[in-house]
């Protein structure tokens, strides 16, 4: 009998402190306090509906990975994240080596909060750094500064997570090749097990789409990618997807399940 593919779960948290001008995800700037308990309750109802729809028995399939994305999931308290994961596990068992990733904004993270997320079951944090240059962060609408980004990476090292990722963008408005590579050097110096190195793209229904900034031309973009790829390779990172680089053994299992045509459920709005 053929074994079923891995099963993963994506959980969406739609709130942010403010909407970034390049973001085309379903995310919304906070206008009042997040209704945490009500939203977690709704997520569980959403999961129950999927379980019934697909006929998933509690011990029939075990979850291989969970990814909590957004939005800014780190706006949700560790206690509510823990309650959410407990309710999920009551319904679908977890593999012993399950990867549970949560996205975090450096501007919403404190030392105790990282540790509390780990205690509640988070095994991997994805930190949305995007750039270490203050002017670029401002252009991107980010709420954090370079110091907060560096601090978040150091905290992730210190709390004993299985892994963590830094999100870094290149091809930013008016960015030179040197600036892009300096950003990458700073990220590599922080020695994350995983680096997601994305080129900025302008998507419909974003502020950047309605008011396009000046981006590097194709020649500069190629130089950034070519030289940056060499830097990452020399630093021991292996490219395993278009924008994903990791140290050996630290690939994002959730992403790999997508690329390998595994099964997944998605809940949230």
Task: List where the protein language model places each region.
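C-terminal scaffold of the Radical SAM
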Residues: 3-8, 27-56, 61-269
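Local cysteine-cluster metal-coordination motifs and their immediate loop/turn environment
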Residues: 14-27
């Amino acid at each position: 009998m053929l074994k079923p593919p891995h099963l993963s779960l994506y959980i969406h948290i739609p709130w942010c402190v403010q909407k970034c001008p390049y973001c085309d995800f379903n995310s919304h700037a906070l206008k009042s306090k997040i209704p945490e308990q009500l939203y977690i309750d709704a997520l569980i109802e959403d999961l129950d509906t999927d379980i019934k729809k697909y006929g998933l028995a509690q011990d029939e399939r075990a979850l291989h990975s969970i990814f909590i994305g957004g939005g800014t999931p780190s706006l949700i308290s560790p206690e509510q994240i823990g309650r959410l994961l407990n309710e999920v596990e009551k319904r679908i068992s977890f593999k012993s080596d399950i990867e549970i990733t949560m996205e975090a904004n450096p501007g919403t993270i404190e030392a105790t909060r990282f540790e509390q997320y780990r205690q509640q079951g988070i095994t991997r944090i994805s930190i949305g750094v995007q750039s270490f240059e203050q002017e670029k962060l401002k252009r991107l609408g980010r709420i954090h500064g370079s110091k907060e980004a560096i601090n978040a990476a150091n905290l992730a090292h210190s709390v004993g997570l299985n892994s963590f990722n830094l999100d870094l963008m290149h091809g930013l408005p008016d960015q030179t090749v040197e600036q892009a590579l300096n950003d990458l050097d700073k990220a590599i110096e922080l020695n994350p097990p995983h680096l997601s190195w994305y080129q900025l793209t302008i998507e419909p229904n974003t502020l950047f789409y309605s008011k396009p900034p000046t981006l590097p031309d194709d020649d500069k973009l190629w130089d950034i990618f070519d030289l940056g790829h060499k830097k990452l390779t020399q630093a021991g990172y292996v490219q395993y997807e278009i924008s994903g680089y990791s140290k050996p053994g630290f690939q994002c299992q959730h992403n790999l399940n997508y690329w390998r045509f595994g099964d997944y459920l998605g809940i949230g709005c």
